[in-house]
Amino acid sequence: MFPIRNTVPTRYPPVITWVLIATNCIAFLFEISLSPYELEQLLYQFALVPARYSEILASDEINPVIDDVLPLFTMMFLHGGWLHLILNMWTLWLFGPTIEDRLGHSRYLAFYLTCGVVASVAHIFFNPVSIVPALGASGAIAGVLGSYMRLFPLARVVVVVPILFIPLFFEVYAFFYVGFWFLMQVLQGMLDLAVTPTRADVAWWAHIGGFVAGFALVPLIVQSERRYRAYYRDEGVLGFDPEGRM
């Protein structure tokens, strides 16, 4: 299933979502302008290398510096290729504006970055000795998906399913589409731990961590019900609950 349309209406321009997409694209254009050696140095400095943090925790003195903390944030603005970038930005473009509309610009930005950091920590926890640089906005975007399912479980998502090279279009409930996506991440993450416990080529647990963070945090920061206009209160058909109750 590939999502092509989010049916939840928005009222305000998704300025922060635009900025995030532009920042990711500019960062990727910078990446591909580098030589292979320069790119390798960039990734090992600003992407997330879990083994680096395992060494810090194993040392007698834990004295984190900015160079150790920065990758928790910067990794979510780096991507490993055009397809990686396009798929992430497409998903952010589909679902980000809805969450930004409900949280407000500043809260949405803080929420997005927090989900990304939690995703980074989850990746380190489940892949502590991996020396493969992890990068991508997937963890933060997973947080957006988690919050979307929490706030709009009955919203319809238009998806395309290719069957024998024939694209078929369906409308499915958000809880089904996002829930299925999350289940696939958990299954892949468990399989990855069983087969390659020391090497994580895909940061499945970053996706899981970001999703759980988004699902859990959004009720705490969403704007209170009394601040919503009738425009929002009429969306009960979508399963919308300002307090994030399921």
Specify the residue positions occupied by each region the protein language model found.
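A detector for small-residue-rich transmembrane helices and their helix-helix packing motifs
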Residues: 1-246
